[in-house]
């Protein structure tokens, strides 16, 4: 059997799930636009993201244990269906003119919980249906999906929302769900686990934590990425405050600069699918992040030109798929398939809990520390030369802080990760 036939199930699953992911993303973006129109509050829209991430932080460990207990395909189908029911509920409430803000928070929390269970099931499914020698390739394709979604999502969502309204956006989302559901239910064969799981959910969760405790390389990489996510999410919170107030910026320019990250990740994803396997995947993870952290933040901190903002985004994001692919291969090969659900779920808790913290800290630092500091020292010629003046200069200062913090994090953790080595040979 040639490699293409071996990957048939993966290609079907990947393509249809990617469309469904795009559909979910455009709905989330459109709901953000709708909510901001209703409230005019950045905090209200940020709360949507917090409601989605809260289940990740709280329930991931137990969700992974459930994944290992039950059939992976059925788990994905049930979770996707319940998430679609949430979306359908929003559609009905919107059409009957009874949609309220708290409805969105509640629906996002339930959808986030479903994603918390579905994500580790999906990760294990990929491991089961893909040959080991193709792990790097599928990691590159998954990165490509995330990149394309990040580019297309705001363009499609804003266009559909402006032309046809929220109802049409949700309809498109439900259609992509139906396509993905039919493909998974009818055409994808997911092999069963080789080991029957009899332990309780709590015991399985403890087993996932125990594996991380006994595998310091994997756990250290996860904690390293938690720090990266903290810096990156603080950056995400600071970027609008840097670009929108700038005379050469504005909301349209923010969209262009943000899309540059997606373009860079598309290029990086294509590189991953074509590049040879590195001699040491652990080194590839922390070196790529050091390059990203030590370039993008500093370029944006000291530049006032849109072209430099775009260049900074591209340099900062082009190596992210390389990091993701190498980390993904390490995890898939280091964790036994029968443990992957619970271990991936533990990974989600430890690696991603810093994202809402970073979003909060980034916004808090810009609004309450950096901008007031720059306003009080507006007379300083040195600070003005470095960060500009007026609103937005504090966000530029925050970029410098994040660049220093991110570089130090990579250097310090790099010294710890240097003792670990991983290659496919």
Q: Residue ranges of each PLM-predicted region?
A:
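Small-residue hotspots at the loop-to-helix junctions and early N-terminal turns
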Residues: 27-30, 34, 39-46, 140, ...
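C-terminal transmembrane bundle of multi-pass solute transporters/carriers
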Residues: 75, 206, 213, 224-227, ...
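MFS-fold secondary transporters
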Residues: 36, 89-94, 111, 184, ...
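Juxtamembrane intracellular "pre-TM" segments in multi-pass secondary transporters
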Residues: 1-10, 189-222
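Transmembrane alpha-helix termini and helix-breaking/packing motifs in multi-pass membrane transporters
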Residues: 32-38, 91-96, 152-172, 245-246, ...
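C-terminal ends and interior cores of transmembrane alpha-helices
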Residues: 81-98, 291-304
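Helix-loop junctions on the cytosolic side of multi-pass membrane transporters
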Residues: 97, 124, 128, 170-200, ...
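Substrate-agnostic recognition of the 12-TM MFS/MFS-like secondary transporter fold
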Residues: 11-29, 49-67, 71-86, 103-162, ...
């Amino acid at each position: 059997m040639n490699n293409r036939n071996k990957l048939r199930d993966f290609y079907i699953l990947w393509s249809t799930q990617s469309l469904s992911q795009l559909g979910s993303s455009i709905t989330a973006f459109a709901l953000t636009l709708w909510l901001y129109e209703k409230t005019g509050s950045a905090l209200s829209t940020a709360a949507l993201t917090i409601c989605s991430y809260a289940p990740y932080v709280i329930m991931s460990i137990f969700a992974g244990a459930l994944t290992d207990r039950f059939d992976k395909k059925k788990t994905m189908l049930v979770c996707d269906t319940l998430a679609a029911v949430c979306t359908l509920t929003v559609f009905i409430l919107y059409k009957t003119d009874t949609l309220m803000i708290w409805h969105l928070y509640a629906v996002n929390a339930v959808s986030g919980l479903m994603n918390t269970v579905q994500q580790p099931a999906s990760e294990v499914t990929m491991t089961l249906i893909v040959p080991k020698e193709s792990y790097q390739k599928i990691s590159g394709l998954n990165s490509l999906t995330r990149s394309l979604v990040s580019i297309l999502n705001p363009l499609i969502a804003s266009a559909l929302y402006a032309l046809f309204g929220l109802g049409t956006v949700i309809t498109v989302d439900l259609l992509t769900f139906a396509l993905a559901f039919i493909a998974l239910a009818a055409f994808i064969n997911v092999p069963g686990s080789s080991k029957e799981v009899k332990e309780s959910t709590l015991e399985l969760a403890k087993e996932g934590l125990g594996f991380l405790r006994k595998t310091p390389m994997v756990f250290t990489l996860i904690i390293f990425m938690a720090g990266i996510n903290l810096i990156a999410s603080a950056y995400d919170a600071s970027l609008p405050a840097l670009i929108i107030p700038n005379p050469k910026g504005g909301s349209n320019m923010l969209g262009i600069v943000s899309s540059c990250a997606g373009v860079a990740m598309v290029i990086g994803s294509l590189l991953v699918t074509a590049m040879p396997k590195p001699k040491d995947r652990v080194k590839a993870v922390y070196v790529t992040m050091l390059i990203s952290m030590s370039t993008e933040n500093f370029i944006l901190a000291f530049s006032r030109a849109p072209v430099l903002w775009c260049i900074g985004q591209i340099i900062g994001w082009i190596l992210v798929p390389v990091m993701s692919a190498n980390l993904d291969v390490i995890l898939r090969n280091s964790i036994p398939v029968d443990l992957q659900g619970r271990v991936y779920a533990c990974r989600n808790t430890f690696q991603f809990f810093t994202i809402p913290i970073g979003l909060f800290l980034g916004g808090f630092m810009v609004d309450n520390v950096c901008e007031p500091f720059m306003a009080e020292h507006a007379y300083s010629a040195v600070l003005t030369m470095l960060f500009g003046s007026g609103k937005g200069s504090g966000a530029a200062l925050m970029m410098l802080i994040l660049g220093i913090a991110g570089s130090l994090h990579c250097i310090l953790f790099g010294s710890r990760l240097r003792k670990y080595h991983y290659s496919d040979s």
